Amino acid sequence: MDIEIRREREDDYRKVEELTREAFWDIHFPGCDEHYLVHVLRSHPDFIPELDYVALVDGKIVGNIMYAKAFVENENGERLEVISFGPVSVLPSYQHKGVGTSLIQHSLRQAMNMGHKVVVIYGHPYNYCKYGFVGAKSLNISDENGRFPYSMLAIEIQKGFLNNHKWKFIPSRVYELDSAESEKFDKTFPKKETGFKPSQEEFRIACHAYVE
């Protein structure tokens, strides 16, 4: 299967929101809000348009990845800019076929070419360690409360960039979504039934798990 990667265009916006909704529906909780995140991220000051990519198969958009600016702060109060990606969305019928891998690898190469040094994300280690991500604790990166979430992962694009300090990750506030606005936005799409999937319990456990 040939996968084409290119920058997202304005006329792709709704298609990307639709595929994101399909990709995440009922995965983390009944329904989803990732399509609303995509919608608001594009107009947020932390958005990095140069790292906004879509994946196409036979001319059809089947995947998307987006990045936002974030920070890490050390024990001296010094801040360094890092970047974070999410959501990474792939239409269910195209998952496990290399689409997500192509988006992640392509965008990481571009991030390196742009001079970015570190990427910090939240995600399941099983999905991201194969790209070089490690538990954030391995790089002395905690959350803002000084704890090490199981799902917080990082990669140094420039090796050694974070040496000799303890860091706290400060994500973009764009990820703090207004649930009422998200529900309102979802009503602009065709109605979908919600339900339970085991992945919702897995997500709940992961969100409450920490590395000591």
Language-model segments: what does each one mean?
Residues D58-G59, S93, E156-F161:
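Short loop segments at secondary-structure junctions
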Residues E17-T20, F24-V72:
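Active-site rim helix/loop that mediates acceptor-substrate recognition in acyltransferases
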Residues I3-V16:
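A short beta-loop-alpha structural element at the N-terminal edge
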Residues N113-K117, Y122-R147:
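Conserved active-site alpha-helix within GNAT-family acetyltransferase domains
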Residues F161-E212:
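Acidic/histidine-enriched, glycine/proline-rich intrinsically disordered or flexible terminal extensions
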Residues F71-S84, Q95:
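A conserved beta-turn-beta hairpin within the catalytic core of GNAT-like acetyltransferases
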Residues L51, A55, G86-S89, G115-H124:
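Internal, conserved structured core segments that host functional sites
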Residues F85, V90, H96-R109, V120-I121:
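Conserved acetyl-CoA-binding loop-helix of GNAT-fold acetyltransferases
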